[in-house]
């Protein structure tokens, strides 16, 4: 039996704000969207353009005005930067670097909802 990665889901409070953040911070773009007929949820699937793996952003109407409990934020996705120094400079200008370990050559960025993403060389 074999499995392959498909997607990771994150619930967000403002779908467009999150789409804009991921486009600017990580170069991800929307490849598919879906909205429930009753308007109770909206989905946006983002891609890096090089793999079939997707980041699914979910907006829930009944949860749009309250923060999600992210626990201790130890679960995260990691991205490899083709140009680490340029990526670091870009994220520093955006003001989204939330943790850095220069000895290990990595840092984390935080999205508008507080999710952390690791950036490595």
Q: For each of these PLM feature ranges, what is it?
A:
Residues 2, 9-52, 107-108:
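Core segments of cupin and vicinal oxygen chelate
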Residues 5-7, 72-76:
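Eukaryotic phosphotyrosine signaling hubs
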């Amino acid at each position: 039996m074999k499995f392959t990665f498909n997607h990771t889901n994150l619930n967000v409070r403002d779908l467009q704000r999150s789409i804009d953040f991921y486009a600017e911070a990580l170069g991800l773009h929307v490849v598919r969207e879906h909205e429930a007929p009753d308007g109770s949820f909206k989905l946006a699937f983002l891609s890096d353009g090089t793999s079939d793996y997707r980041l699914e952003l979910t907006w829930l109407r009944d949860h749009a005005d309250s923060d999600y409990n992210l626990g201790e934020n130890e679960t995260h996705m990691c991205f490899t930067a083709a140009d680490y120094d340029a990526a670091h400079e870009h994220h520093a200008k955006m003001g989204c670097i939330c943790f850095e370990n220069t000895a290990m050559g990595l840092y984390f960025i935080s999205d508008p909802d507080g999710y952390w993403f690791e950036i490595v060389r």
